Amino acid sequence: MKKSFVVLLFLLLGSSAAFSQGDPGPRHGVHVAYLGETLTHPGLSIGYEKYLNEDSKFQVFIRANIGFYHHYRNNNTYMFTLETGFRRNFSSGLFLEQSLGVGYFYRQIHGDGQFTVNENGSIVEKGSLGNSFLPFVANVGLGYHFQTKKAQISPFLRPNFYWKMPFNETPNMQMTVMAGILYSFK
């Protein structure tokens, strides 16, 4: 048993060393993107991707994003998400991707028009403390890879779907659109 374990370990290490001798693709990526709840609520997203494999056709990744968007006369939403997914790369340069994840949203309601009634019956303006949400994230995307000798530059479009909880005691779905540039490097 011990001998077969040593042989198996040797084969696994040998195959991983042989696999890593080729020219590996990008191992990391960063993006900067427009993030908006539709086109009228503009925002910004910055993210980091770590590629977990070296397959040129299928990339498995984990991604962390921070971002915000501004809804005029309503709220500012700040967010952090962690996602994992895969990307199918075609030889033409086109790619399709999908991912799932979780995150944290902090929505700060704008202060104009928020009022409360005091214990003595007078009405006073109330400051905004904001609301927190736990979203589950699902997204799909498409883009195109432009390859250079040292990096890969990829414009992309990614609709994001969020299921926020709690939201008035029930889950609520929201969609944003992300359009940006992904810069992948070794």
Where are these regions (language model features)?
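Sequence/structural signature of outer-membrane beta-barrel proteins
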Residues: 35, 39, 51, 55, ...
